[in-house]
A protein has these predicted regions:
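Core alpha/beta nucleotide-donor-binding catalytic domains of modification enzymes
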Residues: 105-236, 246-249
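Short polybasic/polar patches that bind polyanions
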Residues: 16, 135, 159, 262, ...
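C-terminal target-recognition/interaction regions appended to catalytic cores
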Residues: 4-6, 14, 23-103, 336-461
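Class I S-adenosyl-L-methionine
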Residues: 180-190, 202-368, 458-459
Length: 461
């Protein structure tokens, strides 16, 4: 732009590589995302010259708004000089941003299902919630691809999770997937991407167990943000939702993700979702990063929904006989509790019953029986307690029980314990879907060029 009007100015000997020398002529050909300058002895435009250090430099000056319209009034452009022509194109980040919005608008206008993808899929709890939230707002998702390292989880999702019915499973470490050139060529573009990268190195327990100074020190999962970004570049989603433990937001990986998404043309918002605020009994807190392509309304907030008046754990418990073998005195845990208290560690057992209005966080390794995990108190014998069943765990988190159908107790608790409580994320995805509908009804609202283009503009002057 020059004084409010578009202007394209070249002053360089590199024009000569395309046959555009001082005194020669050329035509301008409009392209979908730019223009092409083609040498033509009888062309509409001429190449001027300017003397510098005793040499004549070719100069091209185009200031027609109509001719430059395919560039969309970009401040920074990509220039490709070939032997037969010069291509002036939108920078890659701007072109990708425009393509994402146009693809999404087209599908929304026709009522077509929106394609989705899942990274670190597990058995698909977050995927199931994403579909439910979008459906609540009147939009259908169709999951095209899921990435998951655990073959058993993949089989469980394909067999028991209805949202995975049409998905292509990619069962391998994502850092391996992104190195497979053939496979990456098969990856489709999608409108919605949800992912829950492993939190082993970000959680306080994970850091403490391995003695990590930072999350990225974890040898297996500390570097996965790179592979995730490679997949994001390939999938080109209009919107991205990442969920993780709250501590993930202060990691180097989170900062890398924020900065790269910004430079890819996304607007990033972050939310700390407390499940209790959304009617859940479980005191589970998760962090969510929501990235929406510039042009889309952003998810500024996720409205909590108060719990149902008077709801207690009893409504979610199985009918377990008082003499069932699952009841136990768990003397080993009581002994450990006594030792911990004597040593001043402060670890204590957490007992719940039918009248409880809250439940402590139920973790991935719940079936191992940790000393601070929640246990159900026997209704008549104060000496006895039991573990929550997988079905009860699912109900507490709001997860459809069919998703863990046929799984062992250990595997079911793993899937649920590393997953999300459904209510807050269903509300988040429903709000994201409403942002999509506002785009459909009112069109895009651009905040401007990608941050990377702004910095290029500042560097070039």
């Amino acid at each position: 732009m020059h004084r409010g009007s578009p202007r394209l100015w070249f002053e360089t000997n590199r024009l000569g590589s395309a046959g555009l020398l001082p005194g020669s002529r050329f035509d301008v050909v409009a392209l979908e995302h730019g223009i092409k300058l083609v040498p033509n002895a009888h062309g509409q435009y001429g190449v001027c010259s300017k003397e510098r250090n005793g040499r004549q430099l070719p100069v091209i000056d185009i200031n027609s708004r109509e001719v430059l319209a395919p560039l969309g009034e970009q401040q920074v452009v990509r220039v490709v000089v070939r032997l037969d022509a010069i291509f002036v194109l939108r920078v890659a980040s701007e072109q990708a941003k425009a393509e994402r919005i146009e693809r999404l608008r087209t599908k929304l206008a026709t009522g077509e299902q929106l394609a989705s993808a899942s990274i670190a899929h597990g058995a698909g709890v977050l995927s199931n919630v994403a579909h439910a939230g979008f459906k609540e707002a009147g939009i259908e998702l169709d999951m095209k691809v899921l990435c998951e390292i655990d073959a058993a989880y993949v089989e469980q999702s394909l067999n028991c999770n209805p949202v995975s019915a049409n998905a292509t499973p990619l069962c391998a470490p994502i850092q391996e997937l992104v190195q497979d050139e053939w496979l990456m060529r098969q990856v489709p573009r999608v409108e919605v991407l949800e992912m829950g990268l492993p939190c082993s190195g970000a959680s306080r327990a994970g850091k403490s167990k391995r003695g990590l100074s930072m999350m990225e020190d974890h040898p297996e999962v500390g570097h996965l943000i790179h592979a995730a970004l490679v997949l994001i570049q390939k999938l080109q989603p209009a919107a991205i939702v990442l969920e993780n433990v709250e501590d993930y937001r202060v990691s180097a990986s989170a900062q890398i993700l924020r900065s790269q998404l910004r430079d890819m043309g996304y607007q990033v918002r972050e939310h700390v979702l407390r499940a209790r605020d959304f009617g859940s009994l479980e005191n589970r807190v998760r962090w969510a990063l929501v990235a929406t392509t510039d042009g889309l309304p952003v998810v500024e907030s996720v409205s909590p929904q108060g719990s149902e008046p008077g709801i207690t754990l009893g409504a979610l418990l199985d009918a377990v006989d008082t003499d069932a073998p699952c009841w136990s005195s768990m003397e080993y845990l009581k002994s450990k509790e006594a030792r911990d208290l004597a040593e001043g560690k402060g670890f204590a057992m957490q007992l719940v019953d039918a009248n409880s209005t809250s439940v402590p966080t139920i973790r991935k390794a719940y079936n191992k029986g940790g000393s601070t995990d929640p246990y159900v108190r026997h209704p008549t014998d104060a000496r006895l307690m039991r573990k929550l069943t997988p079905a009860e765990h699912a109900r507490i988190k709001g997860v459809p029980e069919t998703l863990i159908s046929g799984m062992s107790a250990t595997a079911a608790h793993e899937v649920l314990g590393q997953g999300v409580v459904c209510a807050p994320f269903r509300a988040l995805f429903a709000e994201l879907a409403r942002c999509f509908k506002r785009l459909r009804d009112h069109g895009p609202v651009w905040i401007g060029e990608c941050a990377s283009a702004h910095r290029l503009n500042g560097t070039i002057g």
